Structures are given as structure tokens and as C-alpha cells.
């Protein structure tokens, strides 16, 4: 099998690299510094369209990718030089293994590892209408009680769900939307008729 082809799904690759970085920096005790350096790099990457296209392009050699990542990291004003060097080395490893196109997913997965270690979770809430401050607070407190950690709410207003909520935390979802209930009722009625 060639080095440029892998049967491992990319999200799994993202998680493996992210977990490896997290384990290393956790052992060294500098998770916060590395987290800030990762945020600095992601900010530069997300602001620079040319760099974004370069990272996602499969047409550059490993040598070119390593050289560009090293140059980019040298030009970023990292708050902590040592953390910046660790991120730079990590990016060179990613490039050397032909995984640079997965750098967004890897670094975001690293951020999720850090949040999970702090027992911080993001809950995506889809609501038919905006929630009041009191509803947000009650929802947050309820989720924190169930999850056993700090919950950050990411609220999306989507009138097409008609009413109720859809709550997503990690791979779990609770769907109490009126749209889903009506769809279920429609299916049940179709089964009864046929």
C-alpha cells in the first residue's frame, strides 16, 4: 500500500494526532501554553486564504510543506516561544506524514481534548425561537447536572423545527422538536393505513 493512501477515516486520524499531542503536553504540564499557541496558529491559518489553500492542496511535496510550516511558525508572534516551537515541530510531523490537509481537524480535535480534560462541553441547542436568559440559564444548569461538567451553549434559531428543542452534546442528541414529533406521527399513520 502506498504512503499517500490510507484506509483510516480522517476523523480518526484527527483524533489520533490530537490525542498524541495532548498526551505529550499534558505530561510536560504545559497544556495551557500549547493551547494558546494552537489558537495563534489557527487564527493565522483561518485569516490567510493562500495559506489555507496551500495546507489543503495535495500538490506540494513534503519538503515544501515542512518548509512553509516552519516559515509560518517563525513569523507568528507566539506568546510563549517554547510552546510555539512545540507547535511548529508538531506541524512538521503532520506534514512529514502527509496529513497537513487534516491540520484543521487535528488542531480542533486537540482543543476538544483540552476542553474534555477540563470537563468543559459545548452543547448545540437548536430552537424554533430565541431563548430567554432564564431559559438559557436553566438549560445550562440542567445539562451541567446531567453531564457533570461545565457546559457552553451554542444556540441556533431554526424556525423550521416549529417548536421544542434539539440538543447535541458530543455524539448524543435529544430531539424534542415538534417537526420530529409530527414526522413520527406521519410515519405511524402511514403504517396503520397500509
Curated annotation (Swiss-Prot):
Domain of life: Bacteria
GO cellular component, one term: plasma membrane
A Pfam family recorded for this sequence: OSCP
Membrane topology annotation: Peripheral membrane protein
Keyword Ribonucleoprotein: no
Localization: Cell inner membrane
Listed InterPro entries: ATP_synth_OSCP/delta_N_sf, ATPase_OSCP/d_CS, ATPase_OSCP/dsu
Keyword Hydrolase attributed: no
Gene Ontology molecular functions: proton-transporting ATP synthase activity, rotational mechanism
Entry keyword set: ATP synthesis, Cell inner membrane, Cell membrane, CF(1), Hydrogen ion transport, Ion transport, Membrane, Transport
Family label: Belongs to the ATPase delta chain family.
Function: F(1)F(0) ATP synthase produces ATP from ADP in the presence of a proton or sodium gradient. F-type ATPases consist of two structural domains, F(1) containing the extramembraneous catalytic core and F(0) containing the membrane proton channel, linked together by a central stalk and a peripheral stalk. During catalysis, ATP synthesis in the catalytic domain of F(1) is coupled via a rotary mechanism of the central stalk subunits to proton translocation. This protein is part of the stalk that links CF(0) to CF(1). It either transmits conformational changes from CF(0) to CF(1) or is implicated in proton conduction.
Assembly, per entry: F-type ATPases have 2 components, F(1) - the catalytic core - and F(0) - the membrane proton channel. F(1) has five subunits: alpha(3), beta(3), gamma(1), delta(1), epsilon(1). F(0) has three main subunits: a(1), b(2) and c(10-14). The alpha and beta chains form an alternating ring which encloses part of the gamma chain. F(1) is attached to F(0) by a central stalk formed by the gamma and epsilon chains, while a peripheral stalk is formed by the delta and b chains.
Protein name from the UniProt record: ATP synthase subunit delta
UniProt source species: Bartonella tribocorum (strain CIP 105476 / IBS 506)
